[in-house]
Structures are given as structure tokens and as C-alpha cells.
Amino acid sequence: MDIKQSSEKQGRPHHLSDSRTVLKRNFILIPAYILLQSIVPIIVVFGSLGITAMITQQAPPQWLYHFSLSLSFVIAQGLILVIFYKMHQSEINDVVKQQWIVAKNKIIKIVIVAIVVYLLLLIIRVIGTSLPNHLSYHLTQYEQRTLGLFKSPYVLLVTFISMVFLRPMVEQIIYRYLIIHELGKVWNRQFVIGLSIFIETIVHVYDMASIFEILPYIVIASAATILYIKSRDNLIVAYIFQVILQCILFIEILSKYTNF
């Protein structure tokens, strides 16, 4: 008996919405996330720097800027997850348990995929540095922005929480659950899969300096999407993959680019 049949017999859905009806309320998460990612950093960063300057009568330390910026991302991402939880409060615990039953049996496969993807990223990086000057890049623009959150030891824990745990979950909800699972009820499945990968990629490379910066994010988005689809739209499987990969990337950045 497969997991979905077992879930139905127990009255527990394998997904948050197994019906063919699109839950339109879910899509408020997209503008809410964009809004929170824009407003919360302004409030937290300028608020903390302003209060510090007012109390000390001195310019705030540089680490405080990076800490408050990273903290603002955690707050924004956390708020989105709280909103999503409240929207599905009556069913989400059972769904997570059922999806975890499937996901824990695929851990080895997920780890292997994450390692293969990381090796592909290394190969792409080598190719990127060997291209002609107008096409080459060492770090993508997104990676350069991310490095700012590693400039102080005070920031690392908050950055780790955001980069490894919270952001990947928000991304699974938006790119996999909303776009593929929900929109897939009314639009062509192959189209929404391609749309999901395209949007996830563009969000990371909107300010790219080289067209080849797009390659790493296509690989990551494609791998997460394939795992999601192959596991019958299991968010936990895709999430675990992203957590493992982001943890590897976090350690790499920590070892290469930090010098406290």
C-alpha cells in the first residue's frame, strides 16, 4: 500500500490540498514575501542603527549592520512560515508526518543528489572563470551579496538559520507547492514545472553580470524540482535536499571567505 492510500484510509492527506480546486488564499504568500523581504530589512536595519547611534552618540559598528540585515531576513522568512502554518493549521502536522515517512526512506538518495549537484556547481565555477573576460565570473552577483552576511562572527548563527533552514523552506512553498502543485491543477503540468524553475532561477540572477551566472541556479532548481516530482510532490524531500546543499555551501563560504 503506498503512502497516499495509507493516508486516505487514516483520513490524513499526503498533501495540504489533494482536491482539484486551487486554494487561492495560498497565493497571498507571494506578495507578502516580497513585501516583507523589502520592508522588514528597512525597519530592522535602520531601526537598530538609528537607536544605537542615538544612545551611543557614535557611528554604529559595521558588524551591527550585517547582523541586523541578516536578522531581518530571519524575521521576514519566519513571518511567512507562520502565515503559511496558520493558513493550514488544522492539517499541516499530519501532512508533515506523512511526507516525512516517505522522505526519511530517501535520505541516502537525497544526500547523493546533493553531493552530485555540488560537484556540478564546482565544475560550472571552473568553466565560468575560464571564459572570455566579458563572459567570465568568479562569484555570481548573488554570491557576492551573500558574502556580506559572513563579514562578522556575530552574524554567522543568524545567517546559518536563514540560509540553511528558513529560506529553503520558503522556497519549497513558493516554487514547488504554490507554482507546481497548486497551479498544476489548472495549467499544464510541464508548463508549471518549467515556470517554477525559470522563476526560481531569475530571482537569483536578476542582476547577473554574465549570462553564464544562470547555470548554477538552473542546476539547483532543476535538482530540487526533480526530487519533488519523483517523490510525488513531497515538499520534505525537496527541502532536505536544499538544506544539505545549503549547509555544504555555507561551510565552503565559511572556510574560503571568512577571516576573523
Question: Positions of the model-derived regions?
Answer:
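N-terminal, membrane-interfacial amphipathic/helix-forming hydrophobic leader that caps
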Residues: M1-I110, L119, S210, C247-F260
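Short acidic/polar alpha-helix capping motifs at helix-coil junctions
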Residues: Y33, E143-L147, R189-F191, T201
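Juxtamembrane helix-loop-helix connectors linking adjacent transmembrane helices
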Residues: M54-L64, I92-R167
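Membrane-water interface at transmembrane helix exits
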Residues: V44-T56, F84-Q89, L121, R125-N133, ...
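Generic alpha-helical transmembrane segments of integral inner-membrane proteins
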Residues: L35, I39, I43, I75-V82, ...
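Membrane-associated alpha-helix detector
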Residues: Y33, H138-L139, Q144, Y175-G184
